[in-house]
């Protein structure tokens, strides 16, 4: 089903299901030998959502015949894990280095099943704000409480759709725009129309004191992405057990790249292509088939002032 301006979702449907997919990939990345990341909450959260395929993915419980077919395509469990492991590491490192430098406000936009407020080690006095749909926030908070998990920073949730007046809601939750902030928009931008992406950046800029930092990704050439290959891989992975069509969820219209917009509005920008990040982390290059679906993802690390 195509996106609309007022669509909504939970963690088992539409855009929300992609948050569950990401958590399943984080769980898989946490299970491989010598993992780059460790998210102990990802698998139980995915199990609680209850999508069969993602539950299997999170536990690494692949059907042998299914896995054999993927191996013929050059896709391995480690290879599937590397993409999310490297992305998660990139954002984890941004939060850790920012707070080590003295930043004490962190904002996670479209937080989904992100558990950084629980699994990272935060300096005393750090407040982590999480923004997402009310159902998503409630589900994650309640499930983690049932697991006996406690945040490792002061965690404040802002249950709001980013199409609403989230800057006002964030400030009502105690956010101080006079203090430097580290922001993340992880895996978010492709789910926004171009004009909404620009509004998001404008709001972040308005709320950011000098020294604030924003990390996100951009996908050059999204308008030419081959979604037919993505659908075929979904069938290969999950058969008929997963109804998730990425093409219907993302906005493929041409847009200004995040790095360019931010550079034009007072941010100092560093970019790193996905292939470069893999090399820096000594990971095998991305599988060519997976790589052919999307052009190279570019990570953006921007500092204001």
Curated annotation (Swiss-Prot):
Keyword field contains Cell inner membrane: no
Entry keyword Ribosomal protein: no
Keyword terms: Methyltransferase, S-adenosyl-L-methionine, Transferase
Residues the record lists as binding S-adenosyl-L-methionine: 132, 161-162
The enzyme's E.C. designation: 2.1.1.-
Leading EC class: transferase
Biological process, per Gene Ontology: methylation
Pfam family, one: LCM
GO molecular function, one term: methyltransferase activity
Top-level taxon: Bacteria
SUPFAM superfamilies: S-adenosyl-L-methionine-dependent methyltransferases (SSF53335)
Family, per entry: Belongs to the UPF0677 family.
Main function: Exhibits S-adenosyl-L-methionine-dependent methyltransferase activity.
NCBIfam families on file: mthyl_TIGR00027 (TIGR00027)
Protein name: Putative S-adenosyl-L-methionine-dependent methyltransferase MAB_3787
Organism listed in the record: Mycobacteroides abscessus (strain ATCC 19977 / DSM 44196 / CCUG 20993 / CIP 104536 / JCM 13569 / NCTC 13031 / TMC 1543 / L948) (Mycobacterium abscessus)
Top-level taxonomy: Bacteria, Bacillati, Actinomycetota, Actinomycetes, Mycobacteriales
